[in-house]
Each structure stands twice: as C-alpha cells, then as structure tokens.
A protein has these predicted regions:
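Beta-strand-centric surfaces of beta-sandwich/beta-rich domains
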Residues: 1-281
Length: 281
C-alpha cells in the first residue's frame, strides 16, 4: 500500500519533502442575502493545482470573515454532491475554522471549486472565504515541513517576531513585509519551525511565504480573540491530520520570508506575532 504521507529525502538539517500547503482566499463585495459566487483574490485560484498521478490533494480547513451573518457554500462535482456540497451558516466577525479537525475533503487536479457567500448588501462591504489546501506530492515544490514530534525533539528556544501589516482597503492579500524588517534577532545559520502565531486585530487570513514554503502562502485565520487556536496553529494541524505540516524556515532566507494578510474594506492594520521554535541541528 502506498503511503499518503509526504515523501522525504535526506537533508543535513531536516527532511525535505515534496508536500505543499497553501492558504487561498476568495472574496465578494456587497454580495447580498442570496448566495453569490466569489472570485479568488489576485494571485490565488479556486482551481486545484495539478498533482499528476500523485495522491489527491486535501482541503484541510475553511473559514469566513463576514460583516453580516449569512451562508457560505463550497461545492464541486467531486464532492458528496454538487448541489449544497459543504454549507454553513456564518457569524459576524467569527474567523474560526468550520471543518472538523482531522477529517479532510479530497480535492482533485484542475477541479475548479465553486465558492459562494450570502451576507452584507451594504455598498463596499467585502466578504471573504479562506481555505487551506494540502498537496502530498506537488511537482516542483520544495517546501520544508516537519512533525510536532520532530519539533519537540529538536526544540532549543521559543522565538517570536513581530510584524505590523499595513493592510489595504481593496481586499486581497496586502501589507506584505519581510519578516525581519521590524525585529531581526535570527541566529545565523539556524533553522526555525513556525508553530503558530497571534494577531491583535481581526482579519480574514495571515500567511507566510518564501523559498522554504515553495513560494506558496502557508497560514491561517486572523482570529484575534481565541489566541489558543492560532498560537499552535501548525502544530494543531499536524497532530489533527497526522501529517508533517509545521513549516521550517532557514535564518539565511529571512529577507525573503514575507508576512501578509487579507483584510476587508475597512483596512485595519494587524500586528502579527510569529511564534517560532529554534531547532537543534
């Protein structure tokens, strides 16, 4: 039987794999009380990446950021049904994940997911759906992930980095800045596991991107009130799905690690505290 876990090869410091993790967002403006199709934000796509003959990708989580309570629906001909698919009521300002932990939905190469929301009809109001996709073997990807057990075995120091993101008012990803712009205390030559994060202001999503993530965004919800949810976000994901999902960054790449977020039209700035664990070699 072929394993669906990521493939690994030998690396002097940690295992490298062909797996990839990506958070994507879709938005609509003044969508109204009836379900309306959302559009992927610039740089993202609702089409599942082509993994060739590899094991199917997985939708691990989804969440919303809405200004009027309504409904979210995500569907595909390859889901249980293409009529309602996954459908949830939404709550104003509730950015918490909607899917059960540890149970993923298979998604298939080139399938275009249909994302819909019903919510605010107020002119200019931006409503957002975000989702987190996992690819067990994505051709060309060179992202680096380890398991929670590996993090705990190699943990040396807890290390936090602060970035204040000037998020825009037009929706989509914005406010991107290098992770070392405001605080640069990284140890030369060190490897750091990103175990989680906290934010001080609500936003639809926050993400990190760089060479160590195969230049795909890895991230989660911008939930400011339930910090215990996000402080160990990647550890929680890994444990729930029994996968290596804790991103690892090299200090040498710090200038190329971008932190960014998705915000609505109100454009509130968000301070992100990235929570790293320095790893032994």
């Amino acid at each position: 039987m072929h394993s669906i876990l990521p493939r690994f090869v030998t690396d002097p410091f940690l295992d490298r794999c062909y797996a990839a993790l990506e958070v994507i967002a879709a938005q609509g403006t003044a969508i109204g009380a009836a379900l309306a199709a959302l559009t992927a934000v610039a740089g993202d796509s609702l089409a599942v990446k082509n993994t060739g003959d590899a094991a199917p990708a997985k939708l691990l989580q989804l969440w919303t950021d809405v200004q009027v309570a309504g409904t979210v629906r995500l569907r595909s001909p390859k889901f249980h049904d293409n009529v309602q698919g996954m459908r949830f009521d939404t709550i104003i300002g509730d950015i918490r994940p909607l899917l059960p932990w540890g149970i993923s939905q298979a998604i298939y190469p080139n399938d275009v997911l249909v994302a819909e929301l019903a919510g605010s009809a107020v002119a200019g109001d931006v409503e957002t759906l975000a989702m987190l996709n996992y690819y067990p073997n994505l051709p060309g990807a060179a992202a680096r992930f380890i398991t929670p057990d590996e993090v705990m075995r190699r943990a040396v120091n807890i290390f936090t980095v602060e970035n204040t993101l000037a998020l825009g008012t037009a929706g989509g990803w914005s406010g991107g800045e290098a992770i070392n712009v405001e605080f640069d205390q990284f140890h030369a030559g060190a490897q750091y596991a990103l175990v989680g994060y906290v934010v001080d202001v609500e936003c639809a999503a926050v993400a990190w991107r760089g060479a160590d993530t195969a230049n795909l965004r890895v991230g989660g919800p911008g939930e400011e009130t339930e910090r215990e949810l996000t402080a160990n976000w990647f550890m929680r994901l890994s444990k729930a799905f029994n996968l290596a999902l804790v991103p690892v960054f090299s200090a040498e790449n710090k200038g190329g690690i971008t932190v960014e977020g998705v915000q609505d039209e109100n454009g509130a700035d968000v301070t992100v505290n990235s929570i790293f664990v320095e790893l032994s070699r």
